[in-house]
């Protein structure tokens, strides 16, 4: 809030000493003199001061000198007197040449400034007391200064609060960014963990499936091995049992012609039967596809051993039962 101060002429404040009234005293300074007033003649004071005062008011230094000398003059005793028409004044010369303590006030700047700062006389100008106006002017200036100081203090406090809020907001924004980044990283790691857990579960299931397949294949291999051993044992057994059967057949065949066949014919028939058996055995051991290679491939699941190694890798069906081939085993019959 702005306050208007009463503006005075700078002459009033700069020439304050000029407009002080003359103090009332018994000497020449006691005259109620104003600007350019001639003092009354007093023979008692004539020996101490000049006849006339300056055209303006008494200077502060002269007034201080008068105030300092006044008690000194009154305190000195003397027997000399001077008679005038109306009164008798005692002339009391200074008994001591030492400077009194009061006189040192004039030469002490600090005391002079203290007196100037604390004037007790009213401020007069053209017969009007301006002390209240000057005091009001000083109060207005002090109020303006205090208002300005308070406003500056409030502005500084507001700026400090604003700066503090900005700093707090900047720190909060940085922390929020860091927290968001950490949250995103945590979410990403959580998703990755879920994916890895699902992957581990699927791998465990797949491992169990392959384990079951391996166990089933192992059981199939064991069954095929046992079947193959049985087939090989049967073939080996048939190989050792075939010649007596052929001899018996030849003997029975020869025994049916006892009347007109000779011994030579019996042996001839036995040889032909043997050749026929050999041809049948050779036909059974040859490849049913090409007819050239030896049958050494066992087809599954029909279990027919009717293909050679070359045809077994190229054909997908059994030439005997025409069933599709799912697997094949190579059998080594060499002894």
Curated annotation (Swiss-Prot):
Keywords: Metal-binding, Plant defense, Transferase, Ubl conjugation pathway, Zinc, Zinc-finger. Its EC number is 2.3.2.27. It holds the Pfam family zf-C3HC4_3. PROSITE patterns: ZF_RING_2 (PS50089). Residues 196-232 are annotated as: WRD domain. GO terms for molecular function: transferase activity; zinc ion binding. Pathway: Protein degradation; proteasomal ubiquitin-dependent pathway. One of its GO terms (cellular component) is nucleus. It catalyses: S-ubiquitinyl-[E2 ubiquitin-conjugating enzyme]-L-cysteine + [acceptor protein]-L-lysine = [E2 ubiquitin-conjugating enzyme]-L-cysteine + N(6)-ubiquitinyl-[acceptor protein]-L-lysine. Disruption phenotype: No visible phenotype. Decreased resistance to B.cinerea and increased cell death upon pathogen infection. Boi, brg1, brg2 and brg3 quadruple mutant shows a higher GA signaling resulting in a higher seed germination in the presence of paclobutrazol, precocious juvenile-to-adult phase transition and early flowering. The RING-type zinc finger domain mediates binding to an E2 ubiquitin-conjugating enzyme. Probable E3 ubiquitin-protein ligase. Has no effect on the stability of the DELLA proteins. This is Probable BOI-related E3 ubiquitin-protein ligase 3.
């Amino acid at each position: 809030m702005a306050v208007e101060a009463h503006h005075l002429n700078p002459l009033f404040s700069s020439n304050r000493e000029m407009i002080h009234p003359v103090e009332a005293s018994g000497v020449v300074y006691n005259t109620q003199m104003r600007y350019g007033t001639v003092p009354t003649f007093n023979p008692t004071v004539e020996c101490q001061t000049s006849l006339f005062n300056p055209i303006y008011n008494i200077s502060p230094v002269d007034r201080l000198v008068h105030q300092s000398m006044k008690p000194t003059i009154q305190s000195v005793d003397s027997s000399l007197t001077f008679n005038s028409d109306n009164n008798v004044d005692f002339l009391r010369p200074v008994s001591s040449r030492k400077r009194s303590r009061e006189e040192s006030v004039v030469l002490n700047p600090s005391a002079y400034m203290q007196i100037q700062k604390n004037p007790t006389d009213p401020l007069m100008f053209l017969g009007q007391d301006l002390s209240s106006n000057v005091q009001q002017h000083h109060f207005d200036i002090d109020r303006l200064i205090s208002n300005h100081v308070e406003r500056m203090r409030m502005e500084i406090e507001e700026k400090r609060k604003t700066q503090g809020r900005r700093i707090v907001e900047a720190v909060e924004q940085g922390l929020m960014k860091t927290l968001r980044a950490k949250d995103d990283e945590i979410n990403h790691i959580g998703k990755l963990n879920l994916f890895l857990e699902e992957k581990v579960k699927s791998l465990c299931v797949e491992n169990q499936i392959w384990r079951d397949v391996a166990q089933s294949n192992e059981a199939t291999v064991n069954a095929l091995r046992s079947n193959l051993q049985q087939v090989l044992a049967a073939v080996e057994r048939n190989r050792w049992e075939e010649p007596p059967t052929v001899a018996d057949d030849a003997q029975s065949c020869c025994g049916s012609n006892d009347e007109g066949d000779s011994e030579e014919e019996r042996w001839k028939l036995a040889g032909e039967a043997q050749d026929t058996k050999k041809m049948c055995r050779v036909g059974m051991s040859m490849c049913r596809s090409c007819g050239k290679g030896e049958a050494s491939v066992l087809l599954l699941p029909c279990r027919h051993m009717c293909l050679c190694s070359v045809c077994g890798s190229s054909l997908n069906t059994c030439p005997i039962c025409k069933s599709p081939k799912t697997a094949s085993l190579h059998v080594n019959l060499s002894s």
